Amino acid sequence: MFNYSRRNKIPFHISTQASVANIASAKFYKKLGAERIILARELNLKQVKELKGILPLEAFVHGAMCVAVSGRCFTSQFLFGRSANRGVCIHPCRRSYIIKDKQEGYELELDNDKVMSAKDLCMLPYVEEMKKAGIFSFKIEGRGRDPRYVDAVVREYRKALDKRLTKAEVIEGMKELERVFNRKFSTGFYLGKPTPKDFSDIEHSAATESKEYVGKIVHFYSNAKAGSIKIESNEIKVGDEICIIGNTTGIEKMKIESMQVNNLPVQVGKRGDEVAIKLPERVRKNDDVYVIIRK
């Protein structure tokens, strides 16, 4: 594959699953023609800095962490025939487990029975340190995440890459990241070896916000900057924060200041209503509408 790529002038990067963790392996892949290395997840920042200058370095900065070394896990494949290396892992590491005595079959439930479920990586407060260590490309894990997650995480790290964040901006950024899917946060190996505190006890998500489907956009009037929502589920009220998601629109968030049904002002829109509201940004017919629920 390396020979084929070089012969056809196809650039290639070395995956984190190659576990590049030292100078010798970095130089080895450079000699083979690699243009970039995605570093092993088990390196601390001091070790990363030692690889600076050999090849451009990419590293994970945020997202779910596999309990296996650099993600080389076969548990899902072995138990369920779903290979993590083919993108279809069903995450058996996130399940609850018990200890079983082989001799008598006695079972013990652990205090934290999620013995393989790591917290999510979050390095937002340490982006500057990662830059100084030589990392120039920041990798976000987000397989299977919804548009709100992608929007929030990319937005916050984009800010951190564009300029050095103040302490207040980091705090506000962390609040934004906590609003979307997470299993609580850890710095992984970057600041030292993980401890038991870096394992999660969360069943699903520790997000401080969730979203409930409301309905779809049925009209949008660009000149008036207004449109209407057909409510198919639940209800919306004046003062609610909503997000509108569509393939072309992306994600737009706004607070409902006023609503009308049949040209009459209302405080609540119920299932079956077509509710007219102001829409400051362009949206499109059939975009999905969700109300944001704060926990």
Where are the predicted features?
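N-terminal active-site wall of soluble small-molecule enzyme domains
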Residues: 1-28
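Surface-exposed amphipathic alpha-helical tracts and adjacent flexible/coil segments at the periphery
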Residues: 11, 27, 35-295
